[in-house]
Amino acid sequence: MSHIIELPEMLANQIAAGEVIERPASVVKELVENAIDAGSSQIIIEIEEAGLKKIQITDNGHGIAHDEVELALRRHATSKIKNQADLFRIRTLGFRGEALPSIASVSVLTLLTAVDGASHGTKLVARGGEVEEVIPATSPVGTKVCVEDLFFNTPARLKYMKSQQAELSHIIDIVNRLGLAHPEISFSLISDGKEMTRTAGTGQLRQAIAGIYGLVSAKKMIEIENSDLDFEISGFVSLPELTRANRNYISLFINGRYIKNFLLNRAILDGFGSKLMVGRFPLAVIHIHIDPYLADVNVHPTKQEVRISKEKELMALVSEAIANSLKEQTLIPDALENLAKSTVRNREKVEQTILPLKENTFYYEKTEPSRPSQTEVADYQVELTDEGQDLTLFAKETLDRLTKPAKLHFAERKPANYDQLDHPELDLASIDKAYDKLEREEASSFPELEFFGQMHGTYLFAQGRDGLYIIDQHAAQERVKYEEYRESIGNVDQSQQQLLVPYIFEFPADDALRLKERMPLLEEVGVFLAEYGENQFILREHPIWMAEEEIESGIYEMCDMLLLTKEVSIKKYRAELAIMMSCKRSIKANHRIDDHSARQLLYQLSQCDNPYNCPHGRPVLVHFTKSDMEKMFRRIQENHTSLRELGKY
């Protein structure tokens, strides 16, 4: 029979390391967060062989006193909290005192530090958690932590490390997130002597975004802000024309801490409404300032999961902030820029001789070799990521060689299957209040257009005061009809159209049972089905907004939408129905219309709440300015844009 014993401290630290230190990126995260908590304004991260050989973090923070250096390597020794009350008002990134001893237990760790006013600094060397020496040493104010031979005493962990390229991607992702979280700090990441990422540390979030996403992307992001008594929201989101194939480019920060929160991600998408294409996601960098008492960060070892009080209120604020900022924008894509992007995507090869970083990267002067300020960067045109990408932020774009054109995936519109989302228990009805405020989108000033032609029975040409406009006739009429249906669907007071021959609908037993429970939702949109035999329903009348020839397919699709979700928001349901009906009833491509019909369509479009996107998020029209046309014909030359121009935004 085995007996209960107290584990040795070194073994306990190795066990804790299994939770906190998963890979080299975890070491970078924990050490950089310590540097941030120490009040650093400049942090340099140097790695070799993706961090498995060496990770070195140098900061200019307040350092560690000589008599506290050894104590820093003991479990649960921390300067961040003093008592139980502090645990409910955490204002620092670290607070448990686990990271440094956990890292030391699975590596060879060297720590060099000094505090302001001290006659000398301190050097500590530990191997596998055992302190080998603590000696006085010369050091500038701040701390330098060098971690070598990571996992040397836990070979099983090394077996599960991915390729160096993959591990480096994770490190780049971590540093990028921290750079966006703290634009007031200058970050520099150097891998095997080459600078991979750098932020200026000016305190301007847009400049930090430019350093990570690139200058062109930063210029296509708009500022958002909102607040109430409990929350203060600020940040940037991309215009609908700048999207990615997954949510990995959404960065949320609470009090400077990067978090993952499905409901807040959902609130961001709700703020965009129908302005995004199906399967596309925005770039977003959103800072949320909150009383620490309302956020519990002591939930997960990585501290990326946070429990938030008044979460529904926060969701509404985020959605409202984005929706209000988008209302102020004229969301007509720049046609000339889209043509340029298309040309780059269609290249079969892109010459690349050195490691690519980001589009339109700004440069720093080179100094002597191997100094942190050195950089060697290759410009490239940003490609849209594949939907299967699982590496986050710009890490994958930083590492991949650009030898293939990007693949665009324009998904067919389908009813949303919320059962397959990350949180299948999400109660969509809980955000009805916020969604109701966002459903009505106010139009920005729409240009006065003079129609003069049609091309291929698909595109309308019109002239405005500031140039040429090309309109997708299907998308335009789809938007017009969508807003008409949005008004009429659910108006159950309107008269119903009686059917001479009723329709009978039959469903499998389990679906029929679920439909009985959700029948009130169909009645909310003017569809009254009555039970008729076993697993059958009869329809004797239909709402006037539904054409008789569409009844059978339309009712089945409406029922499918109900069956696909566990919880249904009636506002969402009505919106999906309006999208479905508007798409079916709009003119298609290769359909010629007369001048009167074209002018009438443009007038109806100008009266829409949101005339710039179809309900699926595709652009309705694109714009060539007079300046664009002159550039195309080389009448004028385009000027280069510098980082300093960001101050204009």
Swiss-Prot record:
Keyword terms of this UniProt record: DNA damage, DNA repair
Cited SUPFAM superfamilies: ATPase domain of HSP90 chaperone/DNA topoisomerase II/histidine kinase, DNA mismatch repair protein MutL, Ribosomal protein S5 domain 2-like
Signal peptide start and end residues: none
Statement: the UniProt record of this protein carries the keyword DNA-binding: no
One example of a Gene Ontology biological process annotation: mismatch repair
GO cellular component terms, A-Z: mismatch repair complex
Pfam families, per database record: DNA_mis_repair, HATPase_c_3, MutL_C
InterPro entries noted in UniProt: DNA_mismatch_repair_CS, DNA_mismatch_repair_MutL, DNA_mismatch_S5_2-like, HATPase_C_sf, MutL/Mlh/PMS, MutL/Mlh/Pms-like, MutL_C, MutL_C_dimsub
Molecular function via GO: ATP binding; ATP hydrolysis activity; ATP-dependent DNA damage sensor activity; mismatched DNA binding
Alphabetized Gene3D superfamilies for the sequence: 3.30.230.10, Histidine kinase-like ATPase, C-terminal domain (3.30.565.10), MutL, C-terminal domain, dimerisation subdomain (3.30.1540.20), MutL, C-terminal domain, regulatory subdomain (3.30.1370.100)
Domain of life: Bacteria
Function comment: This protein is involved in the repair of mismatches in DNA. It is required for dam-dependent methyl-directed DNA mismatch repair. May act as a 'molecular matchmaker', a protein that promotes the formation of a stable complex between two or more DNA-binding proteins in an ATP-dependent manner without itself being part of a final effector complex.
PANTHER family in alphabetical order: DNA MISMATCH REPAIR PROTEIN MLH, PMS, MUTL (PTHR10073), DNA MISMATCH REPAIR PROTEIN MLH1 (PTHR10073:SF12)
Family: Belongs to the DNA mismatch repair MutL/HexB family.
Official protein name in the record: DNA mismatch repair protein MutL
Source organism per UniProt: Streptococcus pneumoniae serotype 19F (strain G54)
